[in-house]
């Protein structure tokens, strides 16, 4: 028998559906990307939600400034137009293509998101590569027992090759 939660997730179509990132995982994510941060970088949380990312930024990134958007506060990520140096957040998985496109338009040197592992496709990696961003690091984790694996991914212009290799040959 399928769980009601799993069924609800599969049927959701509202991009405002949210699942907040547990604070301990936020801290792991921020430590995971710390090496990409330069002094004075503007670090951006495009999906404030409960605020766990934005509120934790100053604990990990001590010489930086921060900004955020949150639709519930009247600050829409898709209308944000300031340039940033780094994006670190947990976007809505249902809108990942639009999120990646908008993220690139903000011209950061590094984009790091917590995404569902099924969102990490060859096509999306190739899209990021074609825009000068390479998958430099990944960290797989189980956020919720009722949801599959998720991945912290780091796409950066500071690298010139992906940390994984793949081919799109259909063998049979």
Regions found by a protein language model. Name each.
Residues 1-172:
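Class I S-adenosyl-L-methionine-dependent methyltransferase catalytic core
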């Amino acid at each position: 028998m399928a769980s009601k939660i799993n069924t609800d997730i599969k049927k959701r179509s509202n991009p405002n559906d949210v699942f907040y990132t547990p604070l301990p995982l936020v801290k792991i994510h921020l430590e995971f990307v710390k090496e990409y941060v330069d002094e004075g970088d503007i670090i951006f949380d495009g999906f404030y939600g409960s605020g766990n990312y934005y509120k934790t930024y100053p604990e990990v990134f001590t010489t930086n400034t921060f900004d955020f958007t949150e639709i519930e506060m009247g600050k829409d990520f898709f209308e944000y137009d300031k340039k940033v140096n780094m994006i670190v957040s947990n976007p809505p998985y249902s809108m990942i293509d639009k999120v990646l496109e908008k993220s690139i338009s903000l011209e950061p040197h590094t984009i790091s998101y917590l995404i569902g592992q099924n969102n990490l496709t060859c096509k999306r990696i190739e899209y990021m590569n074609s825009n000068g961003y390479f998958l430099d690091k990944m960290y797989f984790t189980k956020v919720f027992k009722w949801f599959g694996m998720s991945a912290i991914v780091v796409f950066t212009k500071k690298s010139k090759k992906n940390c994984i290799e793949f081919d799109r040959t259909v063998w049979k």
